[in-house]
Curated annotation (Swiss-Prot):
One of its GO terms (biological process) is innate immune response. It is an enzyme of class 3 (hydrolase). Homodimer. Its EC number is 3.5.4.38. This is DNA dC->dU-editing enzyme APOBEC-3H. Antiviral activity is neutralized by the simian immunodeficiency virus rhesus (SIV-mac) virion infectivity factor (VIF). One of its GO terms (molecular function) is cytidine deaminase activity. Zn(2+) binds at residues 54, 85, 88. APOBEC3H from old world monkeys has retained its antiviral activity, while it is lost in other primates. DNA deaminase (cytidine deaminase) which acts as an inhibitor of retrovirus replication and retrotransposon mobility via deaminase-dependent and -independent mechanisms. Exhibits antiviral activity against vif-deficient HIV-1. After the penetration of retroviral nucleocapsids into target cells of infection and the initiation of reverse transcription, it can induce the conversion of cytosine to uracil in the minus-sense single-strand viral DNA, leading to G-to-A hypermutations in the subsequent plus-strand viral DNA.
Length: 210
């Protein structure tokens, strides 16, 4: 497996709200680990966006090409620099529904267009389809650093300090994701409340009108 350079990890998994000078594009990068339930050696790799395909679509195609044994279960963990867009979220849900022997977990360093309703709905769609989406914290950044980065040459930064910095920055992003997830809980609670209250009668409608 080709490994990431320490510089690529530092730049692309950078989860600061704003990039410091000199500015650079924070690209979509996906690191995946496929672990068979029988205890065999995990398969790892990483993918990035290409002109026509997002990293998530390339990941789906990569897993399909492996010809996995459908009688065996696999744990799949993905570390993404950006959370999936709505289109990719839908594709991932369809993929997992068609491949019940795969258990997919997604961890993102940053939330992509998190303020847009359709991007929030994409995240909720994944979570509601048994595809957990979480923000990367210290355990995930550490695992990504240890298993997907080439350590032949010493990095230009202190790895421990970098990982602690990433974990510190992730706290606000985690709270942001929890607020998004709470929307689905609110919608469900409101729906149940409406069912319990039953239809609004004409008289009550008049009393509650403004």
């Amino acid at each position: 497996m080709a490994l990431l350079t320490a510089k690529t990890f530092s730049l692309q998994f950078n989860n600061k709200r704003r990039v410091n000078k000199p500015y650079y594009p924070r690209k979509a990068l996906l690191c995946y680990q496929l672990t068979p339930q029988n205890g065999s050696t995990p398969t790892r790799g990483h993918l990035k966006n290409k002109k026509k395909d997002h990293a998530e679509i390339r990941f789906i195609n990569k897993i399909k090409s492996m010809g996995l044994d459908e009688t065996q279960c696999y744990q799949v963990t993905c570390y993404l620099t950006w959370s999936p867009c709505p289109s990719c979220a839908g594709e991932l849900v369809d993929f997992i529904k068609a491949h019940r022997h795969l258990n997919l977990r997604i961890f993102a360093s940053r939330l992509y267009y998190h303020w847009r309703p359709n991007y929030q709905e994409g995240l909720l769609l994944l979570c509601g389809s048994q595809v957990p989406v979480e923000v990367m914290g210290l355990p995930e950044f550490t695992d990504c650093w240890e298993n997907f980065v080439d350590h032949k040459e010493p990095p230009s930064f202190n790895p421990s300090e970098k990982l602690e910095e990433l974990d510190k920055n992730s706290q606000a992003i985690k709270r942001r994701l929890e607020r998004i997830k709470s929307r689905s809980v609110d919608v469900l609670e409101n729906g149940l409340r409406s069912l319990q209250l039953g239809p609004v009668t004409p008289s009550s409608s008049i009393r509650n009108s403004r």
